[in-house]
Amino acid sequence: MATVASSAAVAVPSFTGLKASGSIKPTTAKIIPTTTAVPRLSVKASLKNVGAAVVATAAAGLLAGNAMAVEVLLGGGDGSLAFLPGDFSVASGEEIVFKNNAGFPHNVVFDEDEIPSGVDAAKISMSEEDLLNAPGETYKVTLTEKGTYKFYCSPHQGAGMVGKVTVN
């Protein structure tokens, strides 16, 4: 245990009317050891908590992964008239974002004869007159009925700008 002794003189101005009387006694300070509360977990409990955190993180990643959209480019960087990718799969309820990649006017029309029965092509397609004219413009659709859907760009269908999506 350590002790500290100190002494100091205090000078008090005379105009206050106060006077220091006598001498200052040395004081001692004692250092008292203290303990800090440390949570104690067994190694087994710690590993259990880490395992639960890993499972929760993985589950969140899977759920977030299902909410992600698939991006399909309308037109290639080289000027080609194509959907990129042209043949792909999505989960039922997954959003598909068709994005104009070039300055050409494009649209997305689902072929009413090449989609699952009971699906209304007009509800999932752009109008044939409606176009994405500028780079970066998008059209979004979510398909819920499982099956194969064929689609095309009406201004460039004759040039082979067609695609297919399989909904699982």
Swiss-Prot record:
It is a peripheral membrane protein. It is found in: Plastid, Chloroplast thylakoid membrane. Cu cation binds at H106, C153, H156, M161. It comes from the Eukaryota. The keyword Transit peptide applies. Its cofactor is Cu(2+). GO terms for cellular component: chloroplast thylakoid lumen; chloroplast thylakoid membrane. InterPro entries: BlueCu_1, BlueCu_1_BS, Copper_blue_Plastocyanin, Cupredoxin, Plastocyanin. One of its GO terms (molecular function) is electron transporter, transferring electrons from cytochrome b6/f complex of photosystem II activity. PROSITE patterns: COPPER_BLUE (PS00196). Keywords: Chloroplast, Copper, Electron transport, Membrane, Metal-binding, Plastid, Thylakoid, Transit peptide, Transport. Residues 70-168 form the Plastocyanin-like domain. Belongs to the plastocyanin family. PANTHER family: PLASTOCYANIN MAJOR ISOFORM, CHLOROPLASTIC-RELATED. Participates in electron transfer between P700 and the cytochrome b6-f complex in photosystem I. This is Plastocyanin, chloroplastic. It comes from Spinacia oleracea (Spinach).
